[in-house]
Swiss-Prot record:
Function: Excises uracil residues from the DNA which can arise as a result of misincorporation of dUMP residues by DNA polymerase or due to deamination of cytosine.
Protein name: Uracil-DNA glycosylase
Database matches in PANTHER family: URACIL-DNA GLYCOSYLASE
Enzyme class: hydrolase
Source species: Mycobacterium sp. (strain KMS)
Length: 227
């Protein structure tokens, strides 16, 4: 991640929303450069670290929270749960998300694991921690990203416009106290990982439930269809 002004790296709405943590973002850039200097790589690629904030702040209607990026080289792309179109096989959590997507919405299995169409339609795919060392899950937790992503979530809630937060798993559920705005609703289920998907993620209907809630609040539902 380069040492550029925040306004050059993210959507202008997000640049304003993240102004309270602008210095923290700069410090995280310094942390990543120190990692590289010490011989440690990080994922995703620098240009994608803040990718979730490249889509319009004012258009976010659904928030899907991840923990930290995929630690497998070639998988992390800066959007929670998403991978590049050519990645095969899919990460198992994403495969389970697609199983539920098909069961919930009746759409065919997507042709690849690229979730960027969702991001373009108002879904913020946000990891709580935005980087990770390759092969070492959770290695960048507690380093400072949480302050940035929690600021982002508070800014979304403060807009007071309809938003549904989809919280998968215990880690995401800890954010629920922040999601208390009059126009914000949270839906929870177990995580889609193979360890917990059968304990209540399958059958949770997150996509149709999110759209039902958006419609009830007078907002446009999400077009969840993927190619």
């Amino acid at each position: 991640m380069t040492a550029r002004a925040l306004s050059e790296l993210v959507d202008q709405g997000w640049a304003q929303a993240l102004e309270p943590v602008r210095e923290q973002v700069a410090q995280m850039g310094e942390f990543l450069r120190a990692e590289l200097a010490a011989g440690h790589r990080y994922l995703p690629a620098g240009a994608n670290v803040l990718r979730a904030f490249s889509f319009p702040f004012d258009q976010v209607r659904v928030l899907i929270v991840g923990q930290d990026p995929y630690p497998t080289p070639g998988h992390a792309v800066g959007l929670s749960f998403s991978v590049d179109p050519e990645v095969r096989p899919l990460p198992r959590s994403l495969a389970n998300i697609f199983t539920e997507y098909t069961a919930d919405l009746g759409y065919p299995q997507p042709s690849n694991g690229d979730l960027s169409p969702w991001a373009q339609r108002g879904v913020l795919l946000l990891n709580r921690v935005l980087t990770v060392r390759p092969g070492t899950p959770a290695s960048h937790r507690g380093k400072g990203w949480e302050a940035v992503t929690e600021c982002a979530i508070r800014a979304l809630v403060a807009r007071d416009t309809p938003m549904v937060a989809v919280l998968w798993g215990r880690d995401a559920a800890t954010l629920k106290p922040m999601l208390t705005g009059s126009a914000c609703v949270a839906i929870e289920s177990p995580h889609p990982s193979p360890l917990s998907a059968s304990r209540g993620f399958f059958g949770s209907r997150p996509f149709s439930r999110a759209n039902e809630l958006l419609t009830q609040m007078g907002a446009e539902p999400i077009d969840w269809r993927l190619p």
